[in-house]
Design a protein with these regions (language model features):
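An alpha-helical support segment within catalytic cores of ATP-dependent transferases
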Residues: 2-10, 117-190
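Hydrophobic packing residues in well-ordered alpha-helices of helical domains and bundles
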Residues: 58, 102-105, 167, 171, ...
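Hydrophobic alpha-helical segments that form the core
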Residues: 256-264
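Active-site Asp-x-Gly
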Residues: 139-146, 155, 186-190, 197-256, ...
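Conserved N-terminal boundary motif of the eukaryotic protein kinase catalytic domain
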Residues: 14-21
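A general structural signal marking secondary-structure boundaries and capping sites
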Residues: 72, 113-120, 157, 182, ...
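ATP/Mg2+ or Mg2+-diphosphate-binding catalytic cores
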Residues: 266-289
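ATP-binding pocket architecture of kinase catalytic cores
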Residues: 22-143
Length: 289
């Protein structure tokens, strides 16, 4: 199996592969590490016999990595090659998160957000794990977020039985009140879009972004997701961020709003074990407690 994958990677990159190892799997993709004949090391996501959805997902991730890197604010691995069945990026050596690196990462994240986007959404179809994201451009964040980040996943989670009728009604109330909950208008920011702690790789004394669902979005979305799944040294990340780009008044009260989308996605992917968190986030938004 790995011999065939080594051949495919070598063909894609135009460089022979001297060794390849499996490195687990996630969302139906095989993870591989490879050493190239020119001395470079690479990480690959592989989907043997990839279909149209796989091709779109790999293209979206490659586009996102390149687009975020254009800001020159936070380091990202270089895209070495992308095809219908492979995404290959540079392999980064493992490091550890330090407080200073976390603060520097927060400042860089603020600068990346400030690089902006042409609109909310993106020119390419999006994916989050195995789920498609509608990146149709919009000009007003609240309605865009409600219609393209909340409603589709609320419906799927309910249809799949992960959320019950009461949960559906509760989140629909949030959607209907999005205008008052969304906060003051902000221009589209250049955001990662899936910024849980596992998508920050600490290497060489810096925080690197990997595996984005990049698009023009609200900058508070990335910060809320870092908080949702426990980023290391979060206080220092926030210090670096707010010291570079202060947040609008009331941002803490909006954290559950920005967390609703990833919670709904997790309910779609993993089932009803996330229903209580969806419910809690919606209730805090509607009642303040």
């Amino acid at each position: 199996m790995t011999a065939g994958q080594a051949t495919r990677i070598g063909e894609l990159l135009g460089v022979p592969v001297t060794s390849v190892r499996t490195a687990g799997a996630q969302h139906g993709y095989q993870h591989l590490t490879a050493r190239l004949a020119d001395g470079r090391q690479a990480f690959a996501k592989a989907a043997p016999g990839g279909d149209e959805a796989t091709a779109e997902a790999f293209a979206a991730e490659a586009n996102g990595l390149r687009w975020l890197a254009e800001a020159g604010a936070v380091p990202l691995p270089r895209v070495l090659g992308v095809s219908r069945d492979l995404l290959v990026i540079e392999l980064l050596p493992d490091g550890r998160a330090t407080q200073d690196a976390a603060e520097e990462f927060g400042a860089g994240l603020a600068r990346m957000h400030a690089a902006g986007a042409a609109s909310f959404g993106a020119p390419w179809p999006g994916y989050l794990a195995s789920l498609p994201l509608d990146n149709t451009p919009g000009t007003e964040w609240g309605s865009w977020y409600a219609e393209q980040r909340l409603v589709p996943y609320l419906k799927k989670a309910h249809d799949d039985g992960a959320l019950d009728d009461a949960d559906l009604s509760l989140v629909e109330t949030v959607v209907n009140r999005i205008g008052e909950l969304a906060g003051p208008p902000e221009p589209p920011s250049r955001i990662h879009g899936d910024l849980w702690a596992g998508n920050v790789l600490w290497s060489g004394g810096r925080g690197w972004l990997i595996d984005p669902a990049a698009h023009g979005g609200h900058r508070e979305t990335d910060l809320a997701m870092l908080a949702l799944f426990g980023a290391p040294h979060l206080e220092r990340i926030m210090r670096g961020y707010t010291g570079t780009a202060p947040l609008a008044d009331g941002w803490r009260a909006r954290v559950p709003l920005h967390q609703l989308h990833p919670l709904l996605v997790h309910a779609c992917l993993f089932g009803g074990s996330y229903a209580a968190q969806v419910r809690a986030a919606a209730r805090v938004l509607l009642t303040g407690s």
